[in-house]
């Protein structure tokens, strides 16, 4: 059961396009009516394409260029500019991809959708550049019945993953509802000597104070523990000016290198819905990213015959 008039929610629709989006103007409109170039990566598409990080989502978004600096860091660009405007549930936040605090590694299992508006977005994000804005919209406890979704999967490079998504009413009427989402993943990589373990947890409580007023409180946490992390890329040229030809699996990360990171956040929002699809919302949000790096950096022009 979805909240009244919430046409922007994508979970449960089974669709690759939203019924409406408020990403550009703050008003729920169809993509055709929206006066900017908008892509909404829905919950169905995230599941079908097995996206497991924000980098995966951005790589599948039209008009977005994704470049990885090394094993942990990615940059996202649009229309020739680096993307600097990021939001959680429409609330601007600060990302710094250069320090690898877990931003691009965020697991999309906790999100209903990811909205990308290409071009200038000063109306909703304030000062920035004309690249794009990225809005990560969290899941909510909308079901008035107990629901459970669990999965276990295995894939290439010794990738193992387990997920749990539980929703339940917390009182007889279902006016207070809770939801817990969790994931654990252990994987190696096409890169030599690299592996990563991550843990994800998200919990939210939604309470209908009246038929038109809803209070939401939630918390999210993700811990990334990679080993064999690399720092930076490889030279394009040998010392004699010739082009290098490295193996795709080559990794400068040593047994002791790592680039651990944690992402945590909390939020509380109060929304009141009026007639004719008008609503007012107040939100408090907190987020914190931390990293702990033990890294090895190599640079220079290697000799073709003798090596670095």
Locate the predicted segments by residue.
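Acidic/polar loop-and-plug regions of large Gram-negative outer-membrane beta-barrel proteins
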Residues: 185-189, 202-273, 277-279, 283-308
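Short acidic/polar hinge/loop motifs at secondary-structure boundaries
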Residues: 66, 75, 91-118, 136-141
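Transmembrane beta-barrel outer-membrane domains
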Residues: 69, 104, 155-159, 194-198, ...
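Extracytoplasmic
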Residues: 33-41, 61, 71-73, 81-83, ...
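Short, glycine-/polar-rich solvent-exposed loops and beta-turns at beta-strand/coil boundaries
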Residues: 34, 57-77, 92, 127-130, ...
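Non-catalytic regulatory/gating segments with a bias toward low-complexity or hydrophobic composition
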Residues: 38, 46, 58, 114-119, ...
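Outer-membrane beta-barrel translocator/receptor signature
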Residues: 94-95, 110-112, 123-203, 209-215, ...
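Short, acidic, small-residue-rich periplasmic hinge/interaction motif at the N-terminus
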Residues: 1-47
């Amino acid at each position: 059961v979805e909240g009244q008039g919430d046409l922007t929610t994508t979970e449960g629709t089974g669709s690759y396009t939203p019924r409406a989006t408020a990403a550009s103007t703050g008003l729920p409109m169809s993509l055709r009516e929206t006066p900017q170039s908008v892509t909404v990566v829905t919950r169905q598409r995230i599941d079908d394409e097995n996206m497991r990080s924000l980098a995966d989502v951005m790589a599948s978004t039209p008009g977005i260029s994704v470049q990885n600096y090394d094993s942990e860091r990615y940059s996202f660009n649009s229309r020739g500019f680096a993307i600097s405007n990021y939001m959680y549930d429409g609330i601007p936040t600060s990302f710094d991809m250069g320090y690898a605090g877990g931003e691009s590694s965020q697991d999309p299992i906790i999100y209903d959708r990811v909205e990308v508006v290409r071009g200038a977005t000063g109306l909703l994000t304030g000062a920035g550049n004309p690249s794009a804005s990225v809005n990560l919209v969290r899941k909510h406890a909308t079901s008035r019945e107990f629901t459970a979704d669990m999965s276990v999967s295995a894939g290439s490079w010794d990738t193992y993953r387990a997920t749990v998504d539980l929703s339940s009413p917390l009182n007889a009427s279902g006016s207070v509802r809770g939801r817990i989402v969790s994931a654990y993943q252990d994987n190696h990589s096409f890169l030599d000597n690299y592996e990563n373990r991550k843990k994800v947890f998200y919990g939210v409580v939604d309470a209908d104070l009246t038929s038109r007023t809803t209070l939401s409180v939630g918390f999210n946490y993700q811990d990334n523990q990679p080993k064999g992390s690399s720092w930076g890329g490889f030279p394009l040229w040998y010392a004699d000016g010739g082009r290098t030809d490295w193996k795709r699996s080559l990794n400068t990360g040593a047994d002791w290198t790592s680039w651990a990171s944690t992402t945590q956040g909390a939020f509380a929002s109060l929304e009141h819905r009026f007639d004719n699809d008008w609503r007012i919302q107040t939100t408090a949000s907190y987020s914190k990213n931390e990293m702990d790096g033990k890294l090895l950096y190599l640079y220079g022009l290697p000799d073709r015959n003798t090596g670095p």
